[in-house]
């Protein structure tokens, strides 16, 4: 995942090149989308049916890459979440700002009773 949101791009430029402070979030969260969130944060995030963003723990970066150091598991869906085609990393458990986003390698339809999981090391963020 290397697609940064407009929000994060501007925050990093301001912090690195303009000496404007940026406060990193204490926790970041994975959000699931049925449409592309885009750099402008305009996608359709899943809602309802027991959906909630899940916190992510990342390991130390190496050569500009970091991966999740713990599995990410969403609650069991109590109804359809639709077809998940994109994920985003956000700075709050609700609302907040989109930081990174990407399309999944393969979309996944979540029906009643399904659980969406991402294994350790399967979510990566790359700055290049």
Kindly give the residue locations of the regions a language model identified.
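Small cysteine-rich, disulfide-bonded extracellular modules of the LU/uPAR three-finger superfamily
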Residues: 1-87, 91-128
């Amino acid at each position: 995942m290397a697609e940064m949101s407009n929000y994060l791009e501007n925050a990093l430029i301001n912090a690195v090149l303009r000496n404007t402070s940026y406060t990193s979030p204490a926790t970041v969260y994975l959000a699931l989308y049925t449409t592309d969130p885009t750099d402008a944060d305009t996608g359709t995030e899943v809602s309802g049916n027991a959906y909630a963003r899940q916190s992510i723990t990342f390991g130390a970066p190496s050569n500009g890459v970091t991966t999740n150091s713990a599995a990410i598991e969403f609650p069991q869906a109590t109804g359809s979440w639709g077809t998940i085609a994109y994920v985003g990393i956000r700075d709050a458990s609700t609302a907040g700002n989109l930081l990174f986003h990407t399309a999944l390698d393969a979309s996944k339809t979540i029906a009643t009773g399904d659980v969406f999981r991402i294994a350790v090391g399967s979510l990566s963020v790359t700055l290049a």
